[in-house]
Amino acid sequence: MKTSLKNLLFITGISLTFHIVPAMAQELSRTQATHLLADTWMRDPYIVIGPDQHYYLTYTNGKMEMPVWRSTNLQDWEKLGEDYNMKKLSYYQNILNSQKELIKERGEAKLWAPEIYYINHQWVAVHTSNLKQSSIITSSSPEFENISEPMKQEFGLKHDPSLFQDTDGKIWLINKCAEIQQLKPDFTGFIGKPIAIHPANRKMGHEGCQIIKIGNKYVWFGTAWSKDTLRKGTYNLYYATADKIEGPYSNRKFAGRCLGHGTIFKDKNGNWWCTAFLNGDYKSPTEVNKGVNPNIATSMNKQGLTLVPMSIEIKDNDIVVKALDPQYAQPGAEENQKF
C-alpha cells in the first residue's frame, strides 16, 4: 500500500504548515532591453524610487490624468490609479477661459510629461499640458490624491519641466531644452532669473531634458530627432557635461538611439537604466540598425514601457554614458551629427 505524505503525517502525529512561496521575479537583463506593460499606451515614462524603496512610474497617457504605478523590482507593476487630473487644479477653469481658441483646435485638456519626486519630505510633481499651462504640485502620497499648489498658475508654461536637487540641497527647474532656474525650497517661487545652457558645439535638442550629478560632474540629457527635424529619423537621447550646473557644458554626445525623453535612473542595486517608449513606426531593432527612412519617424521600442540597461562611468575626468544593449548604443547612418 502506498502511503501519502498526508497519511504519514497523520499516522505519526506530526503537524506541519506549508507555505507556497511565490517564484522570485527574474532579474532584468543587463545586456538587452526589457519590454513591459505591453497593453498600456504611454509616452515620456518617468521612474523614481520612493522613501519606501518602491519604484514609482508615471507617464503621459493621452488624457488629463497622471497615472501612477508601483513596483518592488522594476518587472512586476501594480497600478495605483489616476487620482490626480488637471480638473483638481484651482485654476483649471482659468485655463479653459483663457484658451478657448486653442481648445477648439486641440480639444480637451491633456496632461503631458508628468514627473514625480520625493523632495524635502514630500511628494512633488511637475507636468505641462496642451493648453499652454504647466503645473507644480505637492502631496503627502505618491498617488497625489490630495494636492497643494505652491505656485498656482504663476508657475506658467514650461516645456517638459523637470526637477533636480543638487548635493547642496538647492532645487532646480530644467525645461525648454534647456533653461534652468532655481526654486525656493518650499516650491512657492523662483530664486533668480532663468539661465540658458547650451552644449559647446551645437543645440542639444528640443525637449525631454534631465540633469543628474555623477561625482562633481553635472550630466545634462536632452532629446532630439536624429535628423534634427521633428519626426524625421529616430527619437534619440544626447548629453553634455559640466563642472557647474550653469555650465559651460561640453560638446553634445550620444547617449542612446530611440531613448528620446527617457528617464535615466539608478536602481536599488546601483545599476543605471533608461526608460523608453514607442514614438514613430515600430520596426524591430535588427531592422532599425540596418537603416531607416530618414524622412519617417521610426522606433525600435514596442508599445508600453521599455527599460534599457545603461553604463555611466567616470573616465579621464569626464562622464561616459552608453547603452549596454548594443541595439541602442550607436547612432544610425542617417544621424546629422557625426560622433
Segments and roles (model prediction):
Residues 25-339:
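Carbohydrate-active catalytic/glycan-binding domains of CAZyme proteins
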Residues 1-7:
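Positively charged n-region of N-terminal signal peptides that target proteins for export
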Residues 8-19:
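Bacterial N-terminal signal peptides
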